[in-house]
Amino acid sequence: GTLLIGGYGGIYRYKDTNPYISDYSLNVVNSASVYTLHRLGAKRVTLSYEINKKSLKDLVDAYYKDNDGYPSLEMIVYGRAPLLFTKYCPLKKMNQCGNCKKKQYELQDENFSFPILSHEDCTTTILNGKILNLLDEMNSIEHVEAFRLNFTIESKEEVIQIIEMAKDKLNGSTVSVFNPDTDTRGHFNKEIM
């Protein structure tokens, strides 16, 4: 099957044996990166969480000009972006090893809660306190072949609801699903200098 690869070591290991999609962690924001990944065999290139609308248009235009065709792109339009990867487990440091398998934990500051994903090897991923939600933007995003919904801590019911909202958007719904209290559009509508 098709692999999702987030590092160059994985690309070089599997490029000749498995079809693959490059992941967001390669931080792709320009046409040269897309071209290189396609040359290395990527069937589709996932764009960086950091890309904005103008950068996406510039990337697509430059790629088309240089290659007489559009790139095969994927974009994450829903999900909690990872903010920090740690080599240790905060629960283990507090002598509560194993509790992460029983319930969900989070870091709290004065404004937000940051969910903690615990992994089998006692590493952790700290997730953004706000959810990237570009579902309202999907129909205006051109030349992106696949939109990804990246689920991490959502319940089964939430997953079903979000998939239905995305399908409604792709079918032309104009009802906004963006919640300013819980969601962010990330950098998408911002100018990055």
Pin down the residues of each PLM region:
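Active-site pocket-lining/capping segments in soluble small-molecule metabolic enzymes
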Residues: 1-193
